[in-house]
Design a protein with these regions (language model features):
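Core catalytic alpha/beta fold that binds nucleotide/phospho-ligands
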Residues: 1-163
Length: 163
């Protein structure tokens, strides 16, 4: 599932196991973010996409939500500069990756994925401006955080009754 260059990057974080595992998790998270953003998920062969970590905002020992690391992508050996990736620590050795790419790259095998797009075709200048925007810090939320204020008391009563 990893290209030779990705395995080399993972091994280069050694010899300690934990840094290698963190690099492994970052790469895996990037592959998931890319294939889910495309719409084909695990149907896309992970070996076809190759990531290189680094870029503005990257750094070691980043506290959760404090900094964003970037990555670049090649698919079948071809650089994909129109795709932008952001990796953030969620703490407890977990990583979240988000991706931004052209809607035209989306795969819609069942005909429902592209219907979720707010804008199916994005003019090139708008796409560049959107891709250049900084990535906001990832914020972890509980289910209760997502319940509207007007329903929160009812939700909390129901949640407490089922514990």
């Amino acid at each position: 599932c990893f290209a030779d260059s990705e395995w080399a990057a993972i091994r280069a974080c050694g010899p300690e196991e934990r840094p290698m595992e963190m690099c492994f998790r970052k790469h895996w998270s990037l592959k998931e973010a890319f294939t889910k953003a495309r719409g084909d998920g695990i149907a896309f062969e992970f070996l076809r996409c190759e990531f290189e970590l680094g870029g503005p905002g990257s750094g070691e020992g980043v506290e959760p939500g404090q900094s964003v690391e970037t990555a670049s992508l090649k698919v079948d050996g071809k650089p994909m500069p129109e795709w932008h990736f952001f990796i953030q620590s969620m703490g407890d050795d977990h990583w979240v990756s988000t991706s931004r790419g052209p809607p035209t790259d989306a795969v819609d095998a069942l005909g429902g994925f592209k219907k979720t797009f707010g804008q199916a075709v994005v003019p090139p200048l708008d796409a560049k401006a959107h891709a250049a925007r900084p990535e906001p810090a990832f914020v972890t939320k509980t289910v209760a955080d997502l319940v509207p204020d007007a329903l929160r008391a009812k939700y909390e009563r129901l949640a407490k009754a089922h514990i």
